[in-house]
From Swiss-Prot:
Practical use: Lignocellulose is the most abundant polymeric composite on Earth and is a recalcitrant but promising renewable substrate for industrial biotechnology applications. Together with cellobiose dehydrogenases (CDHs) an enzymatic system capable of oxidative cellulose cleavage is formed, which increases the efficiency of cellulases and put LPMOs at focus of biofuel research.
Described function: Lytic polysaccharide monooxygenase (LPMO) that depolymerizes crystalline and amorphous polysaccharides via the oxidation of scissile alpha- or beta-(1-4)-glycosidic bonds, yielding C4 oxidation products. Catalysis by LPMOs requires the reduction of the active-site copper from Cu(II) to Cu(I) by a reducing agent and H(2)O(2) or O(2) as a cosubstrate. Active on cellulose and cello-oligosaccharides, as well as plant cell wall-derived hemicellulosic polysaccharides. Also active on cello-oligosaccharides such as cellohexaose, cellopentaose or cellotetraose.
Protein name stated in the entry: AA9 family lytic polysaccharide monooxygenase C
A Pfam family: AA9
Class of enzymatic activity (EC top level): oxidoreductase
Taxonomic lineage: Eukaryota, Fungi, Dikarya, Ascomycota, Pezizomycotina
Name of the coding gene: AA9C
Reaction(s) the record says it catalyses: [(1->4)-beta-D-glucosyl]n+m + reduced acceptor + O2 = 4-dehydro-beta-D-glucosyl-[(1->4)-beta-D-glucosyl]n-1 + [(1->4)-beta-D-glucosyl]m + acceptor + H2O
Biased composition (Low complexity): 234-262, 269-304
A single BP term in Gene Ontology: cellulose catabolic process
Similarity remark: Belongs to the polysaccharide monooxygenase AA9 family.
The keyword Signal is assigned to this record: yes
Keywords: Carbohydrate metabolism, Cellulose degradation, Copper, Disulfide bond, Glycoprotein, Metal-binding, Monooxygenase, Oxidoreductase, Polysaccharide degradation, Secreted, Signal
Amino acid sequence: MKSTFGLLALAAAAKLVSAHATVHAVWINDVDQGAGNSADGYIRSPPNNSPITDVTSTDMTCNVNGKNPVAKTLSVKAGDKVTFEWHHDTRSDSDDIIASSHMGPVMVYMAPTEKGTAGNGWVKIAEEGYSNGKWAVANLIANRGKHSITVPDVPAGEYLLRPEIIALHEGNRQGGAQFYMECVQVKVTSAGTKTLPAGVSIPGAYKATDPGVLFDMYNSFTSYPIPGPAVWDGSSSGSSGSSGSSPATTTAPAVSVTAAPTKEAPVDTSATPTTFVTATKPATTAAPAAPSASSGSNSGSDSCNSGSASGSVKIYGQCGGQNYSGPTSCEAGLICKEWNPYYHQCVSA
């Protein structure tokens, strides 16, 4: 019996590892800049796709090895559209980007290269959380791993762009949230006049007990408080201190599409990337209480639970689990997947 349990645990652990993600490439004004996740690329990439779970670790800045510059730096101008492309394994049509259980917010920070490398001066320039019953990560998966920002009108110089995912599938326990991030090296060539605010320190922007970090996505909720500072409005230079769970609404500058010379790499371009134009922090609601027993490893098994509740659950909605009393039937084309004993989710068949 112990042997069987051990094998199941190893299988679950292997599945979790395969579900992780890193940034593989960047597009500028819809032009592919080629793979950037190597020592001779433009992304300060970690040695593997494992998440950071300790919010006090210096690896929170740019991930493991993130203090080490890489060979290339991308040239951008104010108003350029920069698209980040995430994958869990390869830049292929078959890549699943990240596990559909790893729901959570997607954010982007920016800092001058020297300050950012030291963990200081980080300004949030985009965010997407939970809206209309759908997580930002769900949109990321649907868009084949792509999400976009607009380069603000900052002074010329070298900067780091820091895209980030927070996966909350284990966020119902302290230290369970998984952080994925890399730093992309860019050089702004336009002479902007909007100096970045002082920004926040990373590590330091998040606490393990922040409502958007310690968050139980397995119980009923209607909104989600995106952690960290408010999104910079692109013009003010005031404090960018941590806003925690306070509501804030900001609008990013409009996108100006101007082609940049580059070498294109073959990659699927059929999906339209998500562009963060308006980033909204909804009013805070208290995070639901975590289950009395800690959730187990991701089993990934299909669930055929039945219950008395009626109605069909939409994609990525909960459809089962211990102490769950809601609808258990998924909409057509979906199956009810058991991620752990406490949470079953409707996903594509």
